[in-house]
């Protein structure tokens, strides 16, 4: 008979060592526990300084961050976004929220990442590129929709 362990495996256990407890208390005391407030501004400024960019935006989760990225790239309901068929649902939700159509590309057996050969094949057989105001615009032949983005998600995250 196998004896079950009673040892807890910590998963997403809050770690409020250091100043975190005070920061959480400050947020609760001031009522700023959502998308704005002094700590959000400090975080965005720290990211700007660390990365050397002019603008940074804090989002409530990865889905919102991906959606903002798609919006900033100009993706709209007249577009198609290509994504791997093995991905976290946030990627596809962000595309869906942008109004764009999703086209899934199979992943490579060795890496589980979007298969570049299949992507190239899909683009060569399903799209045409024209120049509008000296800028290339690639459209799906069947629908006429613009290829708004290719989202080659790293499926294994931080592993």
Across the structure, where does each feature detected by a protein language model lie?
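Phosphate-binding glycine-rich loop
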Residues: 36-80, 94-97, 104, 128-141
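Conserved donor-binding loops in enzymes that form glycosidic bonds
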Residues: 13-14, 106, 155
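Short beta-strand->loop structural element characteristic of the AMP-binding/adenylate-forming
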Residues: 84, 101-111
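N-terminal "arm"/small-domain region of PLP-dependent enzymes with the aminotransferase-like
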Residues: 1-33
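Active-site phosphate-binding strand-loop segment of PLP-dependent enzymes
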Residues: 110-159
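A short beta-strand submotif of the Rossmann-like class I SAM-dependent methyltransferase core
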Residues: 58, 83, 149-153
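Conserved coil-to-alpha-helix start sites within the AMP-binding
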Residues: 87-92
